[in-house]
Amino acid sequence: MGKDTIADIITSIRNADMEKKGTVRIASTNINISENIVQILLREGFIENVRKHRENNKYFLVSTLRHRRNRKGAYRNILKRISRPGLRIYSNYQRIPRILGGMGIVILSTSRGIMTDREARLEGIGGEILCYIW
């Protein structure tokens, strides 16, 4: 685990998805950011449920990946980190990209917290583009 909490979350989910694991354990160094991103994924239907787990004074978020009904394995979600510590990417609300014509989501960090592209457009605020999920 490095210093980039968001990249660690995305990498943990992507690795669990590639290994066809049902659950993923996300280390929460910054519990607020981790919880907000996982709650967005839960609300948008990319994961099924999430629970907090504490072990030796360390907090973990245990997330269950969403599975297909008639086939084994999880849905293939593509998660891509956009803004990173070495290169920050910002956008106003009018220029927030639409992923797959609105089928995917963009997670942004705004002055009002972490939210999706749809919420940011409705509120008329822009921010730092954290990642794309489709």
From Swiss-Prot:
The keyword Chloroplast applies. One of the primary rRNA binding proteins, it binds directly to 16S rRNA central domain where it helps coordinate assembly of the platform of the 30S subunit. Belongs to the universal ribosomal protein uS8 family. GO terms for molecular function: rRNA binding; structural constituent of ribosome. GO terms for biological process: translation. GO terms for cellular component: chloroplast; ribonucleoprotein complex; ribosome. It is found in: Plastid, Chloroplast. The keyword Ribonucleoprotein applies. Keywords: Chloroplast, Plastid, Ribonucleoprotein, Ribosomal protein, RNA-binding, rRNA-binding. It comes from the Eukaryota. This is Small ribosomal subunit protein uS8c. It comes from Chloranthus spicatus (Chulantree). Part of the 30S ribosomal subunit. InterPro entries: Ribosomal_uS8, Ribosomal_uS8_CS, Ribosomal_uS8_sf.
